[in-house]
């Protein structure tokens, strides 16, 4: 049980019964973060076809993925998905934080940091992640003291998406 000055929450491994809530939260956070120019049909299609109950169930069964959630009294606040098999450039950067999604109602309350700290206790550090250069989460990673170690770009929705790549060590948590 984690406590901060605002609330108490539990962090635990996700179970199959969490998958429907995870799908809803993921679609919600994704649209809130990336649909900055409004809800276009292709955004809705992506979110609804990607973040499904079956998607999260498959992650629970995948040998290199680990999925942890933060909840309070059955209310899902956020989750972290790590991929122990993914590397960025070199093994020295550790494993990948594939997703760190916190519902906007719980952002700024220590949930994201607590999820990353819990992951570090279970799987060690360092860990790396990438985030869209226009994502407000860049401020969070900067405050955390994460080290900017590169950039990563890919094509999506007819545009080039530029991302910052960060490395997080135990000193950041």
Write out the residue ranges for each language-model feature.
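Terminal substrate-recognition subdomain of acyl/acetyltransferases
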Residues: 2-5, 160-173
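A general structural signal for short secondary-structure boundary/capping elements
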Residues: 54-59, 144-145, 149, 162, ...
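Glycine-rich phosphate-binding loop
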Residues: 110
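Conserved active-site alpha-helix within GNAT-family acetyltransferase domains
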Residues: 113-114, 134-151, 159
């Amino acid at each position: 049980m984690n406590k901060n000055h605002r609330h108490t929450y539990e962090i635990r491994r996700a179970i199959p019964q969490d998958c429907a809530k995870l799908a809803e939260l993921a679609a919600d956070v994704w649209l809130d973060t990336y649909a900055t120019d409004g809800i276009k049909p292709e955004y809705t299609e992506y979110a609804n076809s990607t973040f499904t109950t079956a998607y999260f169930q498959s992650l629970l069964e995948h040998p290199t993925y680990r999925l942890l959630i933060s909840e309070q009294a059955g209310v899902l606040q956020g989750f972290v998905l790590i991929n122990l098999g993914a590397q960025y450039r070199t093994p020295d950067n550790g494993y990948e934080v594939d997703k760190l999604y916190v519902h906007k109602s719980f952002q700024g309350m220590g949930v994201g940091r607590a999820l990353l700290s819990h992951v570090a206790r279970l799987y060690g550090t360092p860990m790396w992640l990438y985030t869209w250069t226009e994502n407000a989460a860049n401020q969070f990673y900067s405050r955390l003291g994460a080290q900017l170690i590169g950039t990563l770009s890919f094509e999506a929705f007819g545009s080039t998406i530029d991302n910052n790549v960060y490395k997080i060590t135990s000193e950041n948590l």
